[in-house]
Swiss-Prot record:
PANTHER family: CENTROSOMAL PROTEIN CEP135, TESTIS SPECIFIC 10. Residues 574-588 have a biased composition (Basic and acidic residues). It is found in: Cytoplasm; Cytoplasm, Cytoskeleton, Microtubule organizing center, Centrosome, Centriole. Residues 459-592 are annotated as: Interaction with HIF1A. This is Testis-specific gene 10 protein. Residues 1-20, 563-588 are annotated as: Disordered. It comes from Macaca fascicularis (Crab-eating macaque). Keywords: Cytoplasm, Cytoskeleton, Phosphoprotein. Its main location: cytoplasm. Processed into N-terminal 27-kDa and C-terminal 55-kDa fragments. Plays a role in spermatogenesis. When overexpressed, prevents nuclear localization of HIF1A.
Length: 601
């Protein structure tokens, strides 16, 4: 036992211990049985020898009895001779003393023989009693061996049942692992879809912010155009007044008027080119919007295009400023012409015609402004569609969250199953502990039996010392021992096979315990991932609410700016055309408020 334990690399299971104990018990019991049989044969032979000695002693006793009778006869004869032969008394007395000494020696021999006979009888009785005890012990050991074999069979059946239960648990574990893999894949796909949707939402928000910035810039450009138109009208009024004064100077300034007409024609061409560029920019903006609706991947291109358009708009503003500067230069020239040409009043008709032409240009510019406003409205409609798409994406996010909740419910069910498996495992462990205790009790009983057997062995060794003459019989019994060893080797091979099966079962149990530990680690990792995703969702919601509040503030500031900008021209002039141009700003404010309502929703 100690060698097998020292050689084993790891601690054997209680079932392996029980099997080893059973094997050793079988070996020891078979050896003890054979030794007891040999001892019985020795005792029988010893008894035969003792009986032979008793027979010899009885024959000697009979001889002594005969000699004693003969001595008595001789004594009687001598007495008769003493009576008859008084003379020969001295001779006979010496003979009588000698015979008395012989009688005493014979009596001592007789007493010694009687004592030896009593001792041998007592020793035989003791040996018979010891033989009966040994036979009873052998019977008890046989019964114990039978009980141990039955217990081994029952334990093997229980081990097979436990193996079946472990296989069922392994199958359930595989099913649960498959379910967990599916759930983890679903969670990963949901996380990826959430990330993609959040990216698309962020892209849409960026596009909306860029569109709003573009609309703001266009409104600012329209305001600047209106201011320029008002300035041009003022300049036209001033030119009409000046032309009334310069009616007398027509003849002298005819050539100057021709030059001015050429410059006006150039300005018209420049304005037409600017209007064409504006129409081209509007068409490009519409194309860009269609591209934005089609693909979200071309956002960077759109940004570059918007930057180029902003640069073109800035160039247009610079050109308008240059035109204003040219107009101022023309006014200076006109003043110089007023000082030089007071006699050109006759050419007022041509100047009025030119003023009418300028009014027509102003009307065309107002039409272009209306077109810009219509384009802004289309921008706003597209922004509303983008908001609707954002709302749809948020609904999809809610659906994904519901799917997450269902996945969490599935995870809770899997946890409950894991708890049930742990409880069943604990029950199995308790059963194994109870069996280990039973095996320990059996081992204690076996130890007590071994101690008794060792005592018997010590007694047998003490008796072997007295019976060394019976070693010749052991040679005949060696063949029987060889056959018994062969049978024991076969039994040991069977026991080794059983040990290997038990080792395989223990390895399976260890693998299953490792799998359960890995399963628990996976469950803890999934719980940590879920906590992280929950925290990320909370932070994203907080950032979303913060962005909504910032958008509200920005829209509130932009609305205040638009209101202040629309109030300024109202204080300056009260023409119906300006009131007509004021209505789109109100529509912009309303659309922005509606967009904010959509975002709040």
């Amino acid at each position: 036992m100690m060698r097998s334990r020292s050689k084993s690399p790891r601690r054997p299971s209680p079932t392996a211990r029980g099997a080893n104990c059973d094997v050793e018990l079988l070996k020891t019991t078979t050896r003890d049985r054979e030794e007891l049989k040999c001892m019985l044969e020795k005792y029988e032979r010893h008894l035969a020898e003792i009986q032979g000695n008793v027979k010899v002693l009885t024959s000697e006793r009979d001889k002594t009895f005969l000699l004693y009778e003969q001595a008595q006869e001789e004594i009687a004869r001598l007495r008769r001779e003493m009576k008859s032969l008084a003379r020969k008394a001295m001779d006979t007395e010496s003979e009588l003393g000698r015979q008395k000494a012989e009688n005493n020696s014979l009596r001592l021999l007789y007493e010694n023989t009687e004592k030896d006979l009593s001792d041998t009888q007592r020793h035989l009785a003791k040996k018979k009693y010891e033989l009966q005890l040994t036979q009873e012990k052998i019977m008890c050991l046989d019964e114990k061996i039978d009980n141990f074999t039955r217990q081994n069979i029952a334990q093997r059946e229980e081990i097979s049942i436990l193996g079946g239960t472990l296989n069922d648990l392994a199958k359930e574990k595989e099913c649960l692992q498959a379910c967990l893999d599916k759930k983890s894949e679903n969670i990963a796909s949901l996380g990826e879809s959430l990330a993609m949707k959040e990216k698309t939402i962020s892209g849409m928000k960026n596009i909306i912010a860029e569109m709003e910035q573009a609309s703001r810039q266009s409104t600012e450009a329209l305001i600047m155009c209106e201011q320029d138109i008002s300035r041009m009208r003022r300049q036209l009024d001033e030119t009409n007044d000046e032309l009334a004064q310069i009616a007398r100077e027509r003849d002298i300034l005819a050539h100057d008027n021709d030059n001015l007409q050429e410059q006006f024609a150039k300005a018209k061409q420049e304005n037409q080119a600017l209007s064409k560029k504006l129409n081209d920019t509007h068409n490009e903006l519409n194309d860009i919007k269609q591209k934005v609706q089609d693909t979200n991947l071309e956002v960077n291109k759109l940004k570059n295009i918007l930057k180029s358009e902003e640069s073109e708009n800035r160039q247009m503003m610079e050109q308008l400023r240059k035109a204003n500067e040219d107009a101022e230069n023309w006014e200076n020239k006109a003043r110089q012409s007023e000082a030089d040409n007071n006699t050109l009043k006759l050419e007022l008709i041509t100047a009025e015609a030119e003023g009418n032409r300028l009014k027509e240009k102003v009307d065309s510019l107002s039409r272009e402004v209306e077109q810009h406003l219509n384009a802004e409205r289309s921008y706003k409609s597209q922004i509303s569609t983008l908001h609707k798409s954002v709302v749809k994406m948020e609904e999809e996010l809610q659906k994904v969250q519901f799917e997450k909740v269902s996945a969490l419910a599935d995870l809770s069910s899997t946890r409950e199953l894991c708890i049930k498996l742990d409880s069943s495992k604990e029950l199995l462990n308790r059963q194994l502990v109870a069996k280990d205790q039973e095996i320990e009790m059996m081992e204690n009983e076996l130890d007590s039996a071994r101690s008794e057997i060792e005592l018997l062995r010590s007694q047998m060794t003490n008796e072997r010392i007295s019976m060394q003459n019976l070693e010749a019989l052991l040679v005949a019994n060696r063949d029987k021992e060889y056959q018994s060893q062969i049978a024991l080797q076969e039994k040991e091979s069977e026991i080794q096979l059983l040990k290997e099966h038990l080792c395989l079962a223990e390895n399976k149990m260890a693998i299953q315990s490792r799998d359960v530990a890995q399963f628990r680690n996976v469950v803890t990792q999934l719980e940590a991932d879920l906590d992280i995703t929950k925290r990320q969702l909370g932070t994203e919601r907080f950032e979303r609410e913060r962005a909504v509040q910032e958008l509200r503030r920005q829209n509130y500031s932009s609305n205040a700016y638009h209101v202040s900008s629309t109030m300024k021209p109202n204080t300056k002039c009260h023409s119906p055309e300006r009131a007509h141009h004021r209505s789109p700003d109100r529509g912009l404010d309303r659309s922005l408020e509606e967009n904010l309502c959509y975002r709040d929703f």
